[in-house]
């Protein structure tokens, strides 16, 4: 049975939605930011030389025994609590048996029928509508190694001449977060992963960098005929699982493509094969991987080398009490306290400056000006330099000082940008840069008056037009004064003075 969509263009997504309902469930793997691996003391640093962070335990050598990493358990409980899950007072690990080169033990220590966290939820908002996504379970496991396929054009095993394996990643602590099949659109799928990423980042338990693989998403997609009114429980169709999506854009595009691919097969009278699939970012299409296993294929059984985990209620409640402010609560607070809109906060988050803006406000800046300077000026500079905004050599306190000087009329926006230039160049604090570069607005009224007089004498025709009522013609005169003052004047004040001298109210 073919898994390739029929020849010709796929149906439009809107046409598919008129006839079918997408049913989407997401499995998200999150690498926990512990200093050592899940069951041994090996380091977890990203980017180390291949096979330099390994030991007999994570290589599965005979006689080695695992020991549970307490920090990983703590981080997993925190994630479960933040997702409103029930935390098991007793759970245990299981062996998931399969053979693959990147799995040195030929089994993975995971959890099966007795996971750590169950029955949670996460609310996500798309275009003003809140969607609640149920969380089936959050369980702990160890990551696999990483296969590197050499000699092909795509970096995949097909077409490669040989493969290499790096076991540095083998044994790194993971949590797998599995949703209910509650998602009904690519947009909600993307929003869920985005919100989950922000929540985990707020907890401080992972850097959730999708481009480095510390957050990876598998999307399970099936279609069913659009349910008739009053029949919400129509059976689901056969699902495919698109593996290892490593960006928000890929999550949305892969789900959308799978929806249209499956619709084309069903329309052609074919059936959907339960299989894993791979998403190609360049083409925006998925391709067949392998048939999808059932749980029985993995021959799960309790891990004999680890005792069950029994978590005291006091331990869980202590972690609950210590949770930081979570993204939804933070958004509500910032909207209430500072007058931001939900779109403002999304823009700040997308630019990676939300924390910096809040720190700038705490240093004394007005919310609107803090947002303006970080979003419109500093985020752009960071992007141009290939940096994260946090890595710029300017602090929230510096930005608050600059905005205060602008508000007091001691700097114009143009001068403020020059001050930022100096701070970023390492010339000192904003006040030191102003003194060193001579950037303050000139307070000498006689100098400004002389510049105004010179501008009027130099352009009598423009002056006459303004006197005649063409007030907007004053622009070139303002420019001439600002040039003479080397930008160290308030343009609005210059305009007022020119109009006064020309007798125009």
Swiss-Prot record:
One of its GO terms (molecular function) is ATP binding. Residues 220-241 are annotated as: Disordered. Pfam families: GatB_N, GatB_Yqey. It is an enzyme of class 6 (ligase). Its EC number is 6.3.5.-. InterPro entries: Asn/Gln-tRNA_amidoTrfase_suB/E, Asn/Gln-tRNA_Trfase_suB/E_cat, Asn/Gln_amidotransferase, Asn/Gln_tRNA_amidoTrase-B-like, GatB, GatB_Yqey_C_2, Gln-tRNA_amidoTrfase_suB_CS, Gln_synth/guanido_kin_cat_dom. Heterotrimer of A, B and C subunits. HAMAP family: GatB. Belongs to the GatB/GatE family. GatB subfamily. Allows the formation of correctly charged Asn-tRNA(Asn) or Gln-tRNA(Gln) through the transamidation of misacylated Asp-tRNA(Asn) or Glu-tRNA(Gln) in organisms which lack either or both of asparaginyl-tRNA or glutaminyl-tRNA synthetases. The reaction takes place in the presence of glutamine and ATP through an activated phospho-Asp-tRNA(Asn) or phospho-Glu-tRNA(Gln). This is Aspartyl/glutamyl-tRNA(Asn/Gln) amidotransferase subunit B. It comes from Frankia casuarinae (strain DSM 45818 / CECT 9043 / HFP020203 / CcI3).
């Amino acid at each position: 049975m073919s898994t390739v969509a029929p020849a010709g263009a796929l149906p439009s997504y809107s046409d598919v939605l008129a006839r079918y309902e997408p049913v989407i469930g997401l499995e998200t793997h999150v690498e926990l930011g512990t200093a050592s691996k899940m069951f041994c003391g090996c380091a977890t640093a990203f980017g180390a030389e291949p096979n330099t962070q390994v030991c007999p335990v994570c290589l599965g050598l005979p006689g080695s025994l695992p020991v549970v990493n307490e920090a990983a358990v703590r981080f997993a409980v925190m994630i479960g609590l933040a997702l409103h899950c029930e935390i098991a007072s007793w759970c245990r690990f299981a062996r998931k048996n399969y053979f693959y080169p990147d799995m040195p033990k030929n089994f993975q220590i995971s959890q099966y029928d007795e996971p750590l966290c169950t029955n949670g939820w996460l609310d996500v908002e798309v275009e003003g509508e809140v969607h609640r996504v149920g969380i089936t379970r959050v369980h702990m496991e160890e990551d696999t190694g990483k296969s590197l396929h050499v000699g092909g054009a795509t970096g995949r095993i097909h077409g490669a001449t040989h493969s290499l394996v790096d076991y540095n990643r083998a044994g790194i602590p993971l949590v797998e977060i599995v949703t209910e099949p509650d998602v009904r659109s690519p947009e909600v799928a993307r929003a869920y992963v985005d919100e989950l990423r922000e929540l985990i980042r707020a907890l401080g338990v992972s850097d959730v960098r999708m481009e480095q693989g510390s957050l990876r998403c598998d999307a399970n997609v099936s279609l069913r005929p659009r349910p008739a009114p009053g029949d919400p429980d129509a059976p689901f169709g056969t699902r495919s699982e698109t593996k290892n999506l490593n960006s928000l854009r890929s999550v949305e595009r892969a789900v959308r493509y799978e929806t249209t691919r499956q619709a084309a097969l069903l329309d052609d009278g074919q059936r959907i094969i339960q299989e894993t699939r791979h998403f190609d970012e360049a083409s925006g299409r998925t391709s067949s991987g392998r048939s999808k296993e059932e749980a029985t294929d993995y021959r799960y059984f309790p891990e004999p080398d680890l005792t069950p985990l029994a978590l005291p209620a006091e331990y869980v409640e202590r972690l609950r009490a210590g949770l930081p402010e979570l993204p939804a609560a933070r958004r509500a607070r910032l909207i209430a306290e500072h007058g931001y809109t939900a779109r403002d906060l999304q823009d700040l988050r997308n630019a990676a400056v939300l924390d910096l803006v809040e720190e700038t406000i705490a240093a004394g800046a007005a919310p609107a000006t803090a947002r303006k300077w970080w979003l419109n000026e500093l985020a752009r500079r960071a992007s141009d330099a290939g940096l994260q905004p946090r890595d710029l050599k300017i602090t929230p306190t510096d930005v608050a000082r600059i905005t205060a000087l602008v508000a007091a009329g001691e700097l114009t926006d143009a001068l403020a940008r020059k001050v930022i230039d100096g701070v970023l160049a390492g010339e000192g604090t904003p006040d030191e840069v102003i003194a060193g570069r001579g950037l303050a607005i000139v307070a000498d009224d006689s100098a400004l008056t002389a510049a105004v007089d010179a501008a009027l004498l130099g352009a009598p025709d423009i002056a006459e037009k303004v006197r005649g009522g063409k007030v907007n013609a004053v622009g070139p005169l303002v420019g001439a004064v600002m040039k003479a003052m080397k930008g160290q004047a308030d343009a609005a004040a210059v305009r007022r003075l020119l109009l006064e001298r020309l007798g125009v109210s």
